[in-house]
Protein backbone atom coordinates (compact mmCIF):
# COMPACT_ATOMS: atom_id res chain seq x y z
CA UNK A 1 0.00 0.00 0.00
CA UNK A 2 3.10 2.22 0.03
CA UNK A 3 2.45 3.30 -3.57
CA UNK A 4 -0.66 5.32 -2.69
CA UNK A 5 -0.33 9.12 -2.67
CA UNK A 6 -2.10 9.52 0.68
CA UNK A 7 -1.83 7.34 3.78
CA UNK A 8 -4.61 4.74 3.39
CA UNK A 9 -4.65 4.00 7.14
CA UNK A 10 -5.75 5.73 10.33
CA UNK A 11 -3.59 3.90 12.84
CA UNK A 12 -4.41 0.25 12.17
CA UNK A 13 -7.78 1.03 10.56
CA UNK A 14 -8.67 1.62 6.91
CA UNK A 15 -6.80 0.23 3.92
CA UNK A 16 -7.87 -0.94 0.49
CA UNK A 17 -9.30 -4.47 0.77
CA UNK A 18 -10.87 -4.92 -2.65
CA UNK A 19 -10.70 -7.34 -5.60
CA UNK A 20 -7.49 -6.78 -7.57
CA UNK A 21 -9.50 -5.52 -10.53
CA UNK A 22 -10.58 -2.44 -8.51
CA UNK A 23 -7.13 -1.39 -7.23
CA UNK A 24 -6.21 0.63 -10.36
CA UNK A 25 -9.67 2.26 -10.26
CA UNK A 26 -9.17 3.37 -6.66
CA UNK A 27 -5.69 4.65 -7.47
CA UNK A 28 -7.09 6.66 -10.39
CA UNK A 29 -9.71 8.09 -8.02
CA UNK A 30 -7.02 9.01 -5.49
CA UNK A 31 -4.86 10.68 -8.17
CA UNK A 32 -7.84 12.65 -9.48
CA UNK A 33 -8.84 13.69 -5.96
CA UNK A 34 -5.31 14.87 -5.04
CA UNK A 35 -5.01 16.82 -8.31
CA UNK A 36 -8.46 18.39 -7.78
CA UNK A 37 -7.59 19.45 -4.23
CA UNK A 38 -4.68 21.42 -5.70
CA UNK A 39 -6.61 22.82 -8.66
CA UNK A 40 -8.05 26.32 -8.05
CA UNK A 41 -10.57 25.85 -10.89
CA UNK A 42 -11.99 22.67 -9.33
CA UNK A 43 -12.13 24.30 -5.90
CA UNK A 44 -13.87 27.37 -7.34
CA UNK A 45 -16.51 25.23 -9.07
CA UNK A 46 -17.08 23.13 -5.94
CA UNK A 47 -17.35 26.24 -3.74
CA UNK A 48 -19.73 27.88 -6.20
CA UNK A 49 -22.03 24.82 -6.20
CA UNK A 50 -21.97 24.66 -2.39
CA UNK A 51 -22.93 28.31 -2.14
CA UNK A 52 -25.32 28.88 -5.03
CA UNK A 53 -26.85 25.43 -5.50
CA UNK A 54 -26.68 23.77 -2.07
CA UNK A 55 -27.08 26.91 0.07
CA UNK A 56 -23.94 27.10 2.18
CA UNK A 57 -23.05 28.29 4.73
CA UNK A 58 -25.80 26.71 6.83
CA UNK A 59 -27.06 28.46 9.98
CA UNK A 60 -25.96 27.84 13.56
CA UNK A 61 -29.16 28.10 15.60
CA UNK A 62 -29.44 28.64 19.36
CA UNK A 63 -32.14 26.53 21.04
CA UNK A 64 -34.34 29.00 22.93
CA UNK A 65 -36.63 26.61 24.79
CA UNK A 66 -35.11 23.12 25.01
CA UNK A 67 -32.55 24.16 27.61
CA UNK A 68 -34.88 26.12 29.92
CA UNK A 69 -34.13 25.42 33.56
CA UNK A 70 -30.47 24.67 32.81
CA UNK A 71 -27.29 26.71 32.39
CA UNK A 72 -26.45 25.09 29.04
CA UNK A 73 -26.34 26.93 25.74
CA UNK A 74 -27.21 24.48 22.96
CA UNK A 75 -26.61 25.30 19.31
CA UNK A 76 -27.67 23.28 16.27
CA UNK A 77 -25.58 23.21 13.09
CA UNK A 78 -28.37 23.29 10.53
CA UNK A 79 -27.37 20.82 7.81
CA UNK A 80 -31.11 20.13 7.56
CA UNK A 81 -31.38 23.45 5.68
CA UNK A 82 -29.06 22.29 2.90
CA UNK A 83 -30.58 21.61 -0.53
CA UNK A 84 -31.63 17.95 -0.50
CA UNK A 85 -32.38 18.02 3.22
CA UNK A 86 -29.13 16.73 4.73
CA UNK A 87 -25.33 16.99 4.88
CA UNK A 88 -25.07 14.33 2.16
CA UNK A 89 -25.27 16.98 -0.58
CA UNK A 90 -21.86 18.43 0.36
CA UNK A 91 -19.66 15.51 -0.55
CA UNK A 92 -21.90 14.21 -3.34
CA UNK A 93 -21.25 17.41 -5.30
CA UNK A 94 -17.51 16.93 -4.77
CA UNK A 95 -17.53 13.30 -5.89
CA UNK A 96 -19.81 13.96 -8.88
CA UNK A 97 -17.40 16.67 -10.10
CA UNK A 98 -14.52 14.18 -9.71
CA UNK A 99 -16.46 11.56 -11.71
CA UNK A 100 -16.87 14.03 -14.58
CA UNK A 101 -13.18 14.89 -14.35
CA UNK A 102 -12.35 11.16 -14.71
CA UNK A 103 -14.61 10.87 -17.76
CA UNK A 104 -17.09 8.51 -16.08
CA UNK A 105 -20.50 8.40 -17.75
CA UNK A 106 -22.55 6.60 -15.07
CA UNK A 107 -22.93 6.95 -11.30
CA UNK A 108 -24.02 4.28 -8.85
CA UNK A 109 -24.68 4.71 -5.14
CA UNK A 110 -26.07 2.91 -2.11
CA UNK A 111 -28.53 4.50 0.27
CA UNK A 112 -30.16 3.65 3.60
CA UNK A 113 -32.38 6.52 4.72
CA UNK A 114 -32.55 7.66 1.11
CA UNK A 115 -30.82 10.97 1.85
CA UNK A 116 -27.62 9.96 0.07
CA UNK A 117 -29.72 8.64 -2.81
CA UNK A 118 -31.59 11.95 -3.05
CA UNK A 119 -28.32 13.91 -2.93
CA UNK A 120 -26.81 11.70 -5.63
CA UNK A 121 -29.92 11.99 -7.79
CA UNK A 122 -30.00 15.79 -7.56
CA UNK A 123 -26.28 16.14 -8.32
CA UNK A 124 -26.56 13.76 -11.28
CA UNK A 125 -29.61 15.58 -12.63
CA UNK A 126 -27.79 18.90 -12.40
CA UNK A 127 -24.54 17.56 -13.91
CA UNK A 128 -26.39 15.46 -16.53
CA UNK A 129 -25.14 12.04 -15.40
CA UNK A 130 -27.33 8.89 -15.37
CA UNK A 131 -27.51 7.26 -11.93
CA UNK A 132 -28.56 3.98 -10.35
CA UNK A 133 -29.32 3.81 -6.63
CA UNK A 134 -29.21 0.53 -4.70
CA UNK A 135 -31.47 0.48 -1.66
CA UNK A 136 -32.48 -2.35 0.69
CA UNK A 137 -36.08 -3.42 0.05
CA UNK A 138 -36.89 -2.80 3.73
CA UNK A 139 -35.59 0.77 3.42
CA UNK A 140 -37.51 1.36 0.17
CA UNK A 141 -40.64 0.60 2.20
CA UNK A 142 -39.82 2.79 5.23
CA UNK A 143 -38.43 5.72 3.24
CA UNK A 144 -41.02 6.02 0.46
CA UNK A 145 -40.91 9.87 0.21
CA UNK A 146 -37.20 9.75 -0.62
CA UNK A 147 -37.68 6.93 -3.12
CA UNK A 148 -40.24 9.08 -4.95
CA UNK A 149 -37.86 12.06 -4.89
CA UNK A 150 -35.03 10.03 -6.40
CA UNK A 151 -37.21 8.68 -9.19
CA UNK A 152 -38.66 12.13 -9.84
CA UNK A 153 -35.12 13.41 -10.47
CA UNK A 154 -34.45 10.63 -12.97
CA UNK A 155 -32.60 8.07 -10.85
CA UNK A 156 -33.21 4.35 -11.25
CA UNK A 157 -33.86 2.91 -7.77
CA UNK A 158 -33.16 -0.82 -7.42
CA UNK A 159 -34.67 -2.47 -4.30
CA UNK A 160 -32.23 -5.10 -2.95
CA UNK A 161 -34.06 -8.23 -1.84
CA UNK A 162 -31.03 -10.09 -0.45
CA UNK A 163 -29.95 -10.68 3.16
CA UNK A 164 -31.61 -8.32 5.61
CA UNK A 165 -32.79 -6.08 2.72
CA UNK A 166 -31.02 -3.11 4.36
CA UNK A 167 -28.04 -0.80 3.84
CA UNK A 168 -25.31 -3.44 4.11
CA UNK A 169 -26.96 -5.45 1.32
CA UNK A 170 -27.31 -2.33 -0.83
CA UNK A 171 -23.57 -1.70 -0.33
CA UNK A 172 -22.73 -5.24 -1.48
CA UNK A 173 -24.87 -4.94 -4.62
CA UNK A 174 -23.35 -1.56 -5.49
CA UNK A 175 -19.85 -3.01 -5.05
CA UNK A 176 -20.74 -5.90 -7.40
CA UNK A 177 -22.06 -3.48 -10.02
CA UNK A 178 -18.89 -1.39 -9.74
CA UNK A 179 -16.60 -4.41 -10.16
CA UNK A 180 -18.49 -5.27 -13.38
CA UNK A 181 -18.72 -1.73 -14.81
CA UNK A 182 -15.78 0.22 -13.35
CA UNK A 183 -14.53 1.51 -16.72
CA UNK A 184 -17.61 3.71 -17.24
CA UNK A 185 -18.97 3.91 -13.69
CA UNK A 186 -18.09 5.81 -10.52
CA UNK A 187 -19.34 4.34 -7.25
CA UNK A 188 -20.35 7.38 -5.22
CA UNK A 189 -20.04 5.99 -1.69
CA UNK A 190 -22.28 7.86 0.75
CA UNK A 191 -20.24 7.82 3.92
CA UNK A 192 -16.71 8.17 5.30
CA UNK A 193 -16.17 4.42 5.06
CA UNK A 194 -15.13 1.88 2.43
CA UNK A 195 -11.75 1.37 0.77
CA UNK A 196 -9.12 4.12 0.54
CA UNK A 197 -9.39 6.90 -0.65
CA UNK A 198 -13.12 7.17 0.22
CA UNK A 199 -12.81 7.83 4.00
CA UNK A 200 -10.28 10.64 3.43
CA UNK A 201 -12.06 12.05 0.38
CA UNK A 202 -15.48 12.14 2.04
CA UNK A 203 -14.03 13.83 5.14
CA UNK A 204 -12.41 16.51 2.99
CA UNK A 205 -15.69 17.09 1.15
CA UNK A 206 -17.58 17.35 4.48
CA UNK A 207 -15.10 19.30 6.61
CA UNK A 208 -16.77 22.64 5.86
CA UNK A 209 -19.38 21.61 8.48
CA UNK A 210 -16.83 21.85 11.29
CA UNK A 211 -14.98 24.79 9.78
CA UNK A 212 -18.17 26.86 9.46
CA UNK A 213 -19.31 25.85 12.96
CA UNK A 214 -16.00 26.99 14.42
CA UNK A 215 -16.22 30.42 12.75
CA UNK A 216 -19.89 30.83 13.70
CA UNK A 217 -19.55 29.84 17.36
CA UNK A 218 -16.54 32.16 17.82
CA UNK A 219 -18.60 34.96 16.27
CA UNK A 220 -21.62 34.28 18.51
CA UNK A 221 -19.97 33.25 21.79
CA UNK A 222 -16.39 34.42 21.43
CA UNK A 223 -15.18 30.98 22.49
CA UNK A 224 -15.05 27.37 21.33
CA UNK A 225 -17.75 24.90 22.43
CA UNK A 226 -17.15 22.49 25.28
CA UNK A 227 -18.36 19.64 23.08
CA UNK A 228 -19.57 18.93 19.55
CA UNK A 229 -21.98 16.01 19.21
CA UNK A 230 -22.93 14.08 16.07
CA UNK A 231 -24.66 10.83 15.15
CA UNK A 232 -22.46 8.03 13.80
CA UNK A 233 -23.55 5.39 11.30
CA UNK A 234 -20.81 5.20 8.69
CA UNK A 235 -19.72 8.52 10.14
CA UNK A 236 -19.58 11.23 7.45
CA UNK A 237 -21.59 13.96 9.18
CA UNK A 238 -19.65 13.36 12.40
CA UNK A 239 -16.21 13.39 10.76
CA UNK A 240 -17.22 16.55 8.88
CA UNK A 241 -18.02 18.22 12.20
CA UNK A 242 -15.05 16.74 14.09
CA UNK A 243 -12.56 17.79 11.36
CA UNK A 244 -12.91 21.43 12.42
CA UNK A 245 -12.11 20.64 16.06
CA UNK A 246 -9.73 17.64 16.20
CA UNK A 247 -6.75 19.93 16.83
CA UNK A 248 -8.65 21.89 19.50
CA UNK A 249 -7.95 19.70 22.52
CA UNK A 250 -10.33 21.69 24.75
CA UNK A 251 -13.29 20.61 22.60
CA UNK A 252 -14.78 17.21 23.40
CA UNK A 253 -15.81 15.19 20.32
CA UNK A 254 -18.82 12.95 20.98
CA UNK A 255 -20.11 10.45 18.44
CA UNK A 256 -23.49 8.81 19.04
CA UNK A 257 -24.16 5.30 17.76
CA UNK A 258 -27.64 3.73 17.64
CA UNK A 259 -28.40 1.44 20.60
CA UNK A 260 -31.59 0.34 18.81
CA UNK A 261 -33.79 -1.67 21.17
CA UNK A 262 -30.96 -1.70 23.75
CA UNK A 263 -27.36 -2.91 23.49
CA UNK A 264 -28.23 -5.92 25.69
CA UNK A 265 -30.84 -7.13 23.14
CA UNK A 266 -28.25 -7.43 20.37
CA UNK A 267 -30.57 -5.35 18.17
CA UNK A 268 -28.40 -2.27 17.71
CA UNK A 269 -25.93 -0.62 15.34
CA UNK A 270 -23.02 0.19 17.63
CA UNK A 271 -19.94 -1.59 16.22
CA UNK A 272 -17.45 0.95 17.61
CA UNK A 273 -18.19 0.08 21.20
CA UNK A 274 -19.71 -3.36 20.81
CA UNK A 275 -18.12 -4.85 17.68
CA UNK A 276 -14.76 -6.42 16.83
CA UNK A 277 -12.19 -5.40 14.23
CA UNK A 278 -12.45 -7.11 10.87
CA UNK A 279 -12.52 -6.58 7.12
CA UNK A 280 -15.76 -5.36 5.56
CA UNK A 281 -16.76 -3.05 2.71
CA UNK A 282 -13.15 -2.77 1.54
CA UNK A 283 -11.70 -1.56 4.86
CA UNK A 284 -10.41 -2.75 8.23
CA UNK A 285 -12.65 -1.36 10.96
CA UNK A 286 -14.90 -2.43 13.85
CA UNK A 287 -17.75 -4.63 12.64
CA UNK A 288 -20.73 -6.34 14.17
CA UNK A 289 -19.80 -9.96 13.47
CA UNK A 290 -20.25 -13.45 14.85
CA UNK A 291 -17.36 -15.50 16.28
CA UNK A 292 -17.16 -17.17 12.86
CA UNK A 293 -16.68 -13.80 11.17
CA UNK A 294 -20.16 -13.58 9.64
CA UNK A 295 -21.58 -10.06 9.48
CA UNK A 296 -24.39 -9.65 12.01
CA UNK A 297 -27.52 -7.67 11.28
CA UNK A 298 -27.40 -4.14 12.63
CA UNK A 299 -30.62 -2.49 13.74
CA UNK A 300 -31.84 1.06 14.27
CA UNK A 301 -35.13 2.89 13.92
CA UNK A 302 -33.05 5.22 11.76
CA UNK A 303 -32.31 3.70 8.34
CA UNK A 304 -29.24 5.91 7.91
CA UNK A 305 -27.58 4.51 11.06
CA UNK A 306 -28.51 0.89 10.33
CA UNK A 307 -24.98 -0.16 9.30
CA UNK A 308 -22.82 -2.95 10.79
CA UNK A 309 -19.50 -1.07 10.58
CA UNK A 310 -18.08 2.44 10.92
CA UNK A 311 -15.57 4.70 9.17
CA UNK A 312 -11.91 3.96 10.00
CA UNK A 313 -11.06 7.47 11.23
CA UNK A 314 -13.74 7.15 13.92
CA UNK A 315 -12.21 3.80 14.93
CA UNK A 316 -8.84 5.54 15.20
CA UNK A 317 -10.16 8.54 17.17
CA UNK A 318 -11.83 6.08 19.54
CA UNK A 319 -8.64 4.00 19.92
CA UNK A 320 -6.51 7.03 20.89
CA UNK A 321 -9.21 8.49 23.14
CA UNK A 322 -9.57 11.74 21.17
CA UNK A 323 -13.29 11.18 20.61
CA UNK A 324 -15.84 9.56 22.90
CA UNK A 325 -18.49 7.26 21.45
CA UNK A 326 -21.77 6.61 23.22
CA UNK A 327 -25.11 5.10 22.22
CA UNK A 328 -28.77 6.16 22.28
CA UNK A 329 -31.83 3.90 22.03
CA UNK A 330 -34.72 4.19 19.58
CA UNK A 331 -36.96 5.49 22.36
CA UNK A 332 -34.50 8.18 23.46
CA UNK A 333 -34.12 9.31 19.83
CA UNK A 334 -37.92 9.41 19.39
CA UNK A 335 -38.28 11.51 22.54
CA UNK A 336 -35.66 13.98 21.26
CA UNK A 337 -37.33 14.06 17.82
CA UNK A 338 -40.61 15.11 19.44
CA UNK A 339 -38.98 17.52 21.90
CA UNK A 340 -37.22 19.51 19.18
CA UNK A 341 -40.38 19.67 17.07
CA UNK A 342 -42.56 20.77 19.99
CA UNK A 343 -40.17 23.25 21.63
CA UNK A 344 -38.18 24.71 18.74
CA UNK A 345 -40.34 24.13 15.66
CA UNK A 346 -37.64 22.06 13.94
CA UNK A 347 -38.29 18.48 12.81
CA UNK A 348 -34.95 16.62 12.85
CA UNK A 349 -34.02 13.44 11.02
CA UNK A 350 -34.08 10.34 13.23
CA UNK A 351 -30.32 10.08 12.66
CA UNK A 352 -29.71 13.57 14.08
CA UNK A 353 -32.21 12.86 16.87
CA UNK A 354 -29.69 10.40 18.34
CA UNK A 355 -27.11 13.19 18.72
CA UNK A 356 -29.71 15.57 20.11
CA UNK A 357 -30.90 12.93 22.60
CA UNK A 358 -27.38 12.58 24.00
CA UNK A 359 -27.04 16.36 24.35
CA UNK A 360 -30.36 16.47 26.24
CA UNK A 361 -29.13 13.64 28.46
CA UNK A 362 -25.95 15.59 29.29
CA UNK A 363 -28.02 18.66 30.15
CA UNK A 364 -30.45 16.68 32.34
CA UNK A 365 -27.58 15.02 34.23
CA UNK A 366 -26.16 18.38 35.30
CA UNK A 367 -28.58 21.28 34.75
CA UNK A 368 -26.47 23.68 36.85
CA UNK A 369 -23.34 23.16 34.78
CA UNK A 370 -22.50 26.10 32.52
CA UNK A 371 -21.66 24.51 29.19
CA UNK A 372 -21.69 25.32 25.49
CA UNK A 373 -22.76 22.42 23.27
CA UNK A 374 -23.15 22.09 19.50
CA UNK A 375 -25.21 19.30 17.92
CA UNK A 376 -24.79 18.58 14.23
CA UNK A 377 -28.38 18.50 12.98
CA UNK A 378 -27.35 16.44 9.98
CA UNK A 379 -30.74 16.29 8.25
CA UNK A 380 -34.40 17.12 8.37
CA UNK A 381 -37.10 14.71 9.45
CA UNK A 382 -39.61 14.98 6.59
CA UNK A 383 -38.54 11.51 5.45
CA UNK A 384 -39.25 10.07 8.93
CA UNK A 385 -42.70 11.45 9.69
CA UNK A 386 -44.53 8.32 8.49
CA UNK A 387 -42.25 6.01 10.51
CA UNK A 388 -42.71 8.11 13.64
CA UNK A 389 -46.45 8.49 13.10
CA UNK A 390 -46.79 4.71 12.80
CA UNK A 391 -44.92 4.17 16.09
CA UNK A 392 -46.63 6.95 18.06
CA UNK A 393 -50.04 5.90 16.87
CA UNK A 394 -49.83 2.22 17.64
CA UNK A 395 -47.49 0.82 14.98
CA UNK A 396 -44.41 -1.29 15.80
Curated annotation (Swiss-Prot):
Catalysed reactions listed for this entry: (1S,2R)-1-C-(indol-3-yl)glycerol 3-phosphate + L-serine = D-glyceraldehyde 3-phosphate + L-tryptophan + H2O
Highest taxon, organism lineage: Bacteria
E.C. code: 4.2.1.20
UniProt pathway: Amino-acid biosynthesis; L-tryptophan biosynthesis; L-tryptophan from chorismate: step 5/5
Family membership noted in the UniProt record: Belongs to the TrpB family.
Purpose of the protein: The beta subunit is responsible for the synthesis of L-tryptophan from indole and L-serine.
Protein name as it appears in the record: Tryptophan synthase beta chain
Native source organism of the sequence: Actinobacillus pleuropneumoniae serotype 3 (strain JL03)
Amino acid sequence: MSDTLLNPYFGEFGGMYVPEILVPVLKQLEETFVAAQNDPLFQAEFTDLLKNYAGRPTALTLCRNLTKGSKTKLYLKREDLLHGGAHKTNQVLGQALLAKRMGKTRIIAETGAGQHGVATALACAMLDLPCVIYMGAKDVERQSPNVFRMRLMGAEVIPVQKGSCSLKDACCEAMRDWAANYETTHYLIGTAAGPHPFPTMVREFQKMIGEETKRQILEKENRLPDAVIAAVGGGSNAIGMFAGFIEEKSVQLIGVEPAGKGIETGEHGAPLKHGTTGIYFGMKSPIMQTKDGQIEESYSISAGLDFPSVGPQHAYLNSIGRAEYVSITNQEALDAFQALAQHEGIIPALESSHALAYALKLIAQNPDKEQLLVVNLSGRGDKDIFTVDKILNGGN
